[in-house]
């Protein structure tokens, strides 16, 4: 069956144009749509997008919903096309009962922005029910003395349909004695009366069996039948007569079942069985029969079921009084049901938005409707929420309310809100309903990660393992989810000379710091860098902290003997006159340690000697002195092994081997200073030498002769007391900055001896080229200063 969709348009005259322009959809006539009952599910009713003047996309984007009072899902809105479809078959009799027209109101709710349109679905009746008599057989007793034209009330049929499909006519099977008159009760119900056409003769026909047919107005019409049995009696010339033809009574809806509503009374002037009256309902509907019952003897009307003002406000009953002779009379009882405050307000939630963003003020959290089935003040309601919440209630049309956030929320303070909506009516006593809503607050990236400290100090012992962390930093973010996930990183170094990327790394997930290589205290004692903490949001927020790394010294350098050199192919021999007194300074062992602190404190001791007890070594300065007078028995060649040990844990050591030659007497040898290695990097010096050589060949010849003479002297003096200073590997901080691998001139020495003196000492001369020191780094100068001070430079 096709659904016929109509939209009622009414023309109105208005006095002022401004009044017309100020009218809103909420106050306009509702949209009306019509559909026949029993229409198949999925039937197209209308296109709401066209009716509302909206595009299909706009209709979907605005979150259109269908809300009905009955909360029934009888309509379906297609979000793709905007079509309004029937969601289920409708039974008009079940939905509306006898009410006509059958109108189902509903609302079209648009959320973004909030807007409400009223609409109505009119369900058209179809002829799907035939008239039905409650009693298949109707019995009548008629006195034979009854005059023609007398009317006898018959039981009416019931038809659940309404309008033209409802009960419209009665007929009776053809006969000469009776016909049917149809009467309207004034409330849309018709009932039949059997009218006598001619005088009865009990002796001729004592009983009649006629068929009463009830017809409805449908097309084609439906019908129902009942058998009417008429028993012709002797004369009973008085029918029962009610004291009042109309009874009106008001009954509270909370009256208990079984309570008396009203008592009706009729009189009959006859005697005997003809005067005995029985009360009963006449053409009563099924609803009346379920709600009321009447005492057939006393005429007392009682409640059979609980009344409900919200369902039916008025009942109209027809009561018949019939005597024993078959005569009857009737009266009408009108029962008005009065309302009491027996219904709590109802909260119908249309939509709920949860979670909501914490930085979104004036956000519609929920849309709901308040309904109270009572009337008057009993149906008026007041709606409220707690005072200490950042939300407000805004009333709208048709008892709709919106719950709106009043100001920006702070998820870090409250992650959720438990809102209790209290609805109270104005009846006596007041009834209230509470509805709890939990609103979750979603996180917004409004907090940057924060380090637990503004600066960190890490202590790392040198020669550390790169696989082990040297420390960690930690930052927390008060946000949640990805907004709280922290990524750690190294920030660019502010020191351009610090190779930070090759020195340390950081674990981006947990902030653990790693040294990419083993640290060397002698090369780098401390450094600092900045680390950053960034969350994973977009845009991301970040913070930074300063990390100080202090390298702790380890005893990883053994003492290094500067003098005498131990890697020379020609051993160093020190001359010692046999006439030397005890305490005579033979030589001095000079050593340095690349470590610092107590790891660099050196002590000296004599480990081995050719003549034990002949020599002694001072523990703190390394001076080798005679311990007694020399004798002729002492060997001419003495070999001493001096142990140099630092104060580390565990201690490291080195040995120096000395050769001492005992002589009877000698003059002061002249030892030529070793030639300093040329600085190949100094091109200016080369250019100057070339220029001087080209200008004066005579000067060059003089220099060559001078060198030849010096070499001759050196060859003659070598066997006696000469100490060679050969080239060899040195600690890095002792090697010349030119990179030639030779000992820096600042550590070259000349031995000066005077014959015949028993207190001769070594004199360590100042460097020949003092301007080399400023070329070294500040750290190297600082490391060398203790050694220079010990030597008295």
Swiss-Prot record:
Residues 1-26 form the signal peptide. The keyword Flavoprotein does not apply. It holds the Pfam family Cadherin. The chain crosses the membrane at residues 689-709. GO terms for cellular component: plasma membrane. Its main location: membrane. SMART domains: CA. It comes from the Eukaryota. This is Protocadherin beta-7. It comes from Pan troglodytes (Chimpanzee).
């Amino acid at each position: 069956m096709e659904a016929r969709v109509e939209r009622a348009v009414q023309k109105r005259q208005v006095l002022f144009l401004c009044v017309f322009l100020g009218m809103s959809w909420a106050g306009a006539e509702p949209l009306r749509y019509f559909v026949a009952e029993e229409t198949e599910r999925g039937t197209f009713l209308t296109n709401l997008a066209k009716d509302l003047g909206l595009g299909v996309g706009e209709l979907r984007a605005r979150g259109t919903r269908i809300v009905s009072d009955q909360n029934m899902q009888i309509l379906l809105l297609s979000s793709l096309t905007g079509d309004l479809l029937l969601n289920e078959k409708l039974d008009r009799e079940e939905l509306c009962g006898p009410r006509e027209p059958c109108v189902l109101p509903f609302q079209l709710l648009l959320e973004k922005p909030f807007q409400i349109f009223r609409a109505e679905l009119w369900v058209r009746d179809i002829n799907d029910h035939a008239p039905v008599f409650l009693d298949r057989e109707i019995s009548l007793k008629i006195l034979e003395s009854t005059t023609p034209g007398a009317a006898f009330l018959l039981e009416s049929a019931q038809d659940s349909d309404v309008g033209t499909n409802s009960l419209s006519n009665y007929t009776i099977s053809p006969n000469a004695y009776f016909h049917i008159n149809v009467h309207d009760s004034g409330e849309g119900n018709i009932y039949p009366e059997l009218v006598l056409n001619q005088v009865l003769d009990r002796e001729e026909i004592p009983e009649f069996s006629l068929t009463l047919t009830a017809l409805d107005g449908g097309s084609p019409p439906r019908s129902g039948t009942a058998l009417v049995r008429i028993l012709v009696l002797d004369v009973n010339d008085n029918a029962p007569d009610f004291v009042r033809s109309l009874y009106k009574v008001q009954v509270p809806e909370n009256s208990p079942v079984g309570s008396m509503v009203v008592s009706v009374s009729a009189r009959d002037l006859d005697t005997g069985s003809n005067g005995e009256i029985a009360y009963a309902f006449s053409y009563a509907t099924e609803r009346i029969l379920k709600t009321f019952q009447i005492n057939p003897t006393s005429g007392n009307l009682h409640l059979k079921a609980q009344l409900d003002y919200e369902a039916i406000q008025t009942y109209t009953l027809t009561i018949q009084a019939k005597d024993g002779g078959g005569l009857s009379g009737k009266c009408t009882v009108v029962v008005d049901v009065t309302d009491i405050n027996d219904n709590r307000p109802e909260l119908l939630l249309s939509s709920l938005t949860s979670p909501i963003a914490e930085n979104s003020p004036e956000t519609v959290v929920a849309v709901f409707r308040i309904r109270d089935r009572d009337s008057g003040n009993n149906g008026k309601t007041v709606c409220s929420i707690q005072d200490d919440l950042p939300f407000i209630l805004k009333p709208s049309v048709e008892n709709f309310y919106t719950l709106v956030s009043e100001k920006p929320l702070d998820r870090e303070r409250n992650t959720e809100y438990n809102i209790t909506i209290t609805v109270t009516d104005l009846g006596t006593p007041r009834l209230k309903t509470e509805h709890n809503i939990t609103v979750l607050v979603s996180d917004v990236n409004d907090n940057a990660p924060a380090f637990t400290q503004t600066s960190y100090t890490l202590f790392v012992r040198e020669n550390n393992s790169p696989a082990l962390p040297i420390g960690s930093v930690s930052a927390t973010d008060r946000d949640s989810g990805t907004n709280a996930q922290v990524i750690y990183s190294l920030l660019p170094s502010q020191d351009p000379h610090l190779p930070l990327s090759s020195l340390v790394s950081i674990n981006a997930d947990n902030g653990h710091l790693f040294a990419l290589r083993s640290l060397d205290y002698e090369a780098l004692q401390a450094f600092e860098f900045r680390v950053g903490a960034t969350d994973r949001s977009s845009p991301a927020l970040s913070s930074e902290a300063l990390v100080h790394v202090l390298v702790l010294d380890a005893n990883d350098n053994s003492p290094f003997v500067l003098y005498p050199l131990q890697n020379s192919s020609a051993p160093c021999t020190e001359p010692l006159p046999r006439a030397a007194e005890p305490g005579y300074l033979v030589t001095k062992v000079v050593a340095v340690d690349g470590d610092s602190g107590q790891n660099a404190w050196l002590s000296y001791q004599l480990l081995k000697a050719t003549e034990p007890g002949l020599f002694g070594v001072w523990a703190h300065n390394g001076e080798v002195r005679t311990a007694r007078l020399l004798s002729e028995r002492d060997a001419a060649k003495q070999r001493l092994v001096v142990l140099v040990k630092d104060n580390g844990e565990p201690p490291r050591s080195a040995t120096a081997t000395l050769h001492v030659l005992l002589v009877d007497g000698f003059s002061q040898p002249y030892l030529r200073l070793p030639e300093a290695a040329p600085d190949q990097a100094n091109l200016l010096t080369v250019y100057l030498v070339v220029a001087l050589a080209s200008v004066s060949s005579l000067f060059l010849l003089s220099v060559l002769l001078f060198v030849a003479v010096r070499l001759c002297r050196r060859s003659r003096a070598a066997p006696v007391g000469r100490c060679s200073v050969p080239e060899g590997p040195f600690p890095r901080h002792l090697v010349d900055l030119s990179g030639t691998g030779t000992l820096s001139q600042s550590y070259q020495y000349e031995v000066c001896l005077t014959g015949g003196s028993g207190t001769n000492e070594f004199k360590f001369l100042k460097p020949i080229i003092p301007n080399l020191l400023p070329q070294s780094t500040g750290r190297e100068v600082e490391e060398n200063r203790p050694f220079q001070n010990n030597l008295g430079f």
